Amino acid sequence: MAKALDLGCGPIPNNPFKANEIFGVDIVSNLAPNIATADLAIEAIPFPANYFQYVTAYQFIEHVPRVIYAPTRRNSFVELMNEIYRVLEKDGIFLSVTPAYPHNAAFQDPTHVNIITEETFRFYFAMPNRWASIYGFTGSFELIAQDWMGVNLVTQLRKT
């Protein structure tokens, strides 16, 4: 049975892969029994390793700061990508749908603190580059698809 996790899901998790079991994580508490509460900018994804076939993030990645200084310097976006890698099983898929540069939607919301480009996932988290490894990224993804849907960059990565 396929299991999927939707990050920053609000009250209803997305399920684009038609998984049998769907879970969510949101900063707001008590949304539904299948939705865990966590601030993913500073907390781990509250599920075990290798648990999901799919992890999705709709309109979420842009809200996770790249770096925070509380109480010490942390690369919170890189830490989140490590967490996504950790909870995905081998060959699991991560789907990100996020407003991205050069579109105004990437900048206009003051809570958009992580500006994504076509190169962000390709060069920093996918083979053969994995440039984020110098900032602590320990995973390894393969970029399997990337395209634009309006102002949103739609990216699919496979855990290798």
Predicted segments, located by residue:
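A short acidic, Gly/Pro-enriched loop at the edge of an enzyme's catalytic core
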Residues: 42-56
